[in-house]
Amino acid sequence: MASPSDPAVPAEAIEPAPRRRNLSPWASWSLHLRSVVDEDPCPDAAAAVPAWRERVRTRLAAMLGSPPPAVPLDPEVTDEVDAGDHVRRRILYDVEPTMSVPAYLLVPKDRLAGPPGPAVLAVHGHGPGKEMICGLTGPAQEHYALQLVRLGYVVLTPDLRCFGERQDPQWSPEVHKYDCDWNLVAATMAGAVPLAQNLWDLQRSVDLLVAHPLVDPARIAVAGLSYGATMSLFLAATDDRIGAVIVSGYLSSWRAAHSVPWNMCGSQVLPGQLGRLEHLDVASLIAPRPILVESGTEDPLFPVDTARATVASLRRVYAALGADPGRVEHDVFEGGHRWNGARTEAFLAGPW
């Protein structure tokens, strides 16, 4: 056998050692994350922030794409339940020619006769959908729609696509854990984006609230945990009818969140956003409206240190835009990836 020093063996046939190789997609992704540089970071100079924010707005609109054709909502109340201190109504309404949304409308009993007053669009995260946040299942800590109606707000709680009643009934429970995956596949083939699809559904949900006789159109807030917080942030950033927003268990950065090996749902991302659209960028579009951020000290998905840094940067953005940085509130609590709710009442009672 020829040795490496044998002149009969071409030099290019000898593999240098050691040679680093990687077979792990996750490791490759992690290495890529470390190399990402923001193309258009928030400028340090306050005078440059307004123009930067408009560039963010343009990038976000391009990533979301064009909305589907609007159809009449044609709302229908299919059920009404006396829930003690409030009434829970099941509502169906149309958002696309081939898609409808089921939702609960929670109305405090002392609001049933009017006049129009404030409302909150409560957006669920991963889990059973609207049932849990309305207090019909799951731990009490996650019943934030129930908390909101008991604070006196009319609350609309739609099921997002692939959750709750919008899971496909012909499939087994085992298959349901892949609902977001197949929806991502279907949307990709159709040239659509699941985040944009759910954002459209929420914008149409705002249309429903605006037209409701018990709702003051100038007093609509949005609140959500985890994926619900993702959608709450994007909704407030793209719809000026939202007067205030509560973002729980989310605001930090994509780079920090994706450095943790956990199963990321494809419904929470946009094509080409890495290095071009960070949490701070989206949040900047909410100014000067008030935002309450909740962060658990033990949240394994959205690190609290990154959340603190992002909130500090967001306050600087507010100041640069001539808005009160005090309108960016941060509730850091002892705990993990969950809703806290300790400052919800005071926050929503403030000016917005």
Stretches found by the model and what they are:
Residues P213-S226:
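Alpha/beta-hydrolase fold nucleophile elbow
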Residues V81-D82, L92-E96, A103-P116, G138:
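Short beta-strand-to-loop junctions in surface cap/lid or active-site-entrance loops
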Residues M1-V87, V95:
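N-terminal targeting or regulatory segments adjacent to alpha/beta-hydrolase or S9 domains
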Residues G224-F234:
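Glycine-rich nucleophile elbow surrounding the catalytic serine of serine-hydrolase chemistry
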Residues I286, V293-S295:
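Short beta-strand/loop motif that positions the catalytic acidic residue
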Residues L112-P116, L121-W200, D207-A211, A256-S259:
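Cap/lid segment of the alpha/beta-hydrolase catalytic domain
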Residues S3-P4, A312-S313, Y318-W352:
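C-terminal catalytic histidine-bearing segment of alpha/beta-hydrolase fold enzymes
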Residues W182, T188-M189, R204, I242-A283, ...:
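Mobile cap/lid helix-loop segments that gate and shape the active-site cleft of serine hydrolases
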